[in-house]
């Protein structure tokens, strides 16, 4: 029988639990500047137990997302493969801790602490967008932790497709929900305010999943200040010279411009065993747009 387990990790003394009060999430000092090692923060995760001895599947969401983005595919793949499946909230997202450091080095360090702690290494890392780049960096830095890698609709190559992200953050910051009496009312108001900037209803719905009630107030659980301050880091992959020689799949949406066939030569420079596969009729959120095709591609790569 499949069973969800949910837990927190607190690798450093002094980072205490915050229950569900997102406004009081602990702030970890930034320490990835000047070459010092980033300090990991407590991450929220869900682990779906499995009986197979095969490497666990670890899902990393994209910018503005959360671990819940993968609930359906995680449960389905756990049932189909018998593997353990982990979904994780990145720092400054979902129910994970907030920190002023939003670098890929910091997000990789978070996982370098969490995954061995849970006994899930080596694992199959499956990352979408920002999560894909985090997975790529972790594989380059600590290849012994990654049995194989799947990057979903992202590569290390910079694209112009993310140029609207600053507008998303500005629009979310501008929403005033002080007079709203219910979460449904706050979401309706926020949707109306965001519509003038974000025409895509699916993107607005993704952003609205981050609207929560804290102490009678409606707030964004995302750390928008950290995202805004370090968006340039999120949109740019760190310069690396290492290579990851494990099996690697770059899975792109056929209707997306984030990952293109022209990126393949640069991808192969860092990931010499990389394959590229296209999911037709899928946009950037491949796992949401075409979940069955997405899971079929994952299963084929695992075979």
Swiss-Prot record:
EC numbers for this chain: 3.1.1.116
UniProt subcellular location: Mitochondrion; Mitochondrion matrix
**Could you tell me the superkingdom of the organism this chain comes from?**
Eukaryota
Range annotated as the organelle transit peptide: 1-22
According to the entry, every stretch annotated as the AB hydrolase-1 domain falls at 55-290
Record PTM text: Phosphorylated.
A Pfam family found in this protein is Abhydrolase_1
Reactions catalysed: a 1,3-diacyl-sn-glycerol + H2O = a 1-acyl-sn-glycerol + a fatty acid + H(+); 1-octadecanoyl-2-(9Z-octadecenoyl)-sn-glycerol + H2O = 2-(9Z-octadecenoyl)-glycerol + octadecanoate + H(+); 1-octadecanoyl-2-(4Z,7Z,10Z,13Z,16Z,19Z-docosahexaenoyl)-sn-glycerol + H2O = 2-(4Z,7Z,10Z,13Z,16Z,19Z-docosahexaenoyl)-glycerol + octadecanoate + H(+); a 1,2-diacyl-sn-glycerol + H2O = a 2-acylglycerol + a fatty acid + H(+)
Q: Can the keyword Transit peptide be found in this entry's annotation?
A: yes
At the top of the EC hierarchy, this enzyme's class is hydrolase
Name the active site residues.
129 (charge relay system), 225 (charge relay system), 284 (charge relay system)
Q: Mind telling me which GO cellular component terms the entry cites?
A: mitochondrial matrix; mitochondrion; oxoglutarate dehydrogenase complex
Keywords (A to Z) from UniProt: Hydrolase, Mitochondrion, Transit peptide
Which coarse location class describes where this protein primarily resides?
mitochondrion
A Gene Ontology biological process in which this protein takes part is: lipid metabolic process
Family the UniProt entry places it in = Belongs to the AB hydrolase superfamily.
Listed under subunit, the entry gives:
Interacts with OGDH and DLST; this interaction maintains the functional lipoylation of the 2-oxoglutarate dehydrogenase complex.
| UniProt-recorded name of the protein | sn-1-specific diacylglycerol lipase ABHD11
The organism of origin for this protein: Bos taurus
């Amino acid at each position: 029988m499949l069973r969800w387990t949910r837990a927190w990790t607190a690798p450093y003394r002094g980072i205490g639990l915050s229950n569900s009060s997102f406004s009081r999430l602990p702030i970890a000092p930034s320490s990835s500047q000047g070459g010092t090692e980033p300090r990991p923060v407590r991450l929220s995760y869900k682990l779906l137990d499995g009986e197979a001895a095969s490497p666990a599947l670890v899902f990393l969401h994209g910018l503005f997302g959360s671990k819940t983005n993968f609930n359906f595919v995680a449960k389905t793949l756990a049932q189909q493969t018998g593997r353990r499946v982990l979904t994780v909230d990145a720092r400054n997202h979902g129910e994970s801790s907030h920190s002023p450091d939003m670098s890929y080095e910091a997000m990789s360090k978070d996982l370098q602490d969490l995954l061995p702690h849970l006994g899930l290494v080596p694992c199959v890392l499956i990352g979408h967008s920002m999560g894909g780049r985090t997975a790529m960096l972790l594989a380059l830095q600590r290849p012994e932790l990654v049995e194989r890698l799947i990057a979903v609709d992202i590569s290390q190559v910079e694209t112009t497709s993310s140029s609207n992200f600053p507008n998303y953050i500005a629009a979310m910051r501008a929403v005033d929900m002080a007079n709203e009496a219910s979460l449904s009312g706050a979401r309706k108001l926020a949707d109306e305010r965001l519509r003038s900037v974000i025409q895509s209803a699916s993107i607005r719905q993704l952003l609205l999943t981050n609207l929560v009630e804290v102490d009678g107030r409606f707030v964004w659980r995302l750390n928008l200040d950290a995202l805004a301050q370090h968006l340039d880091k999120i949109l740019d992959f760190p310069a690396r010279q290492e290579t990851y020689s494990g099996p690697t799949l770059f899975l792109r949406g056929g209707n997306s411009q984030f990952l293109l066939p022209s990126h393949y030569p640069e991808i192969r420079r860092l990931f010499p065993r990389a394959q590229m596969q296209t999911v037709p009729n899928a946009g950037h959120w491949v796992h949401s747009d075409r979940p069955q095709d997405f899971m079929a591609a994952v299963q084929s790569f695992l075979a």
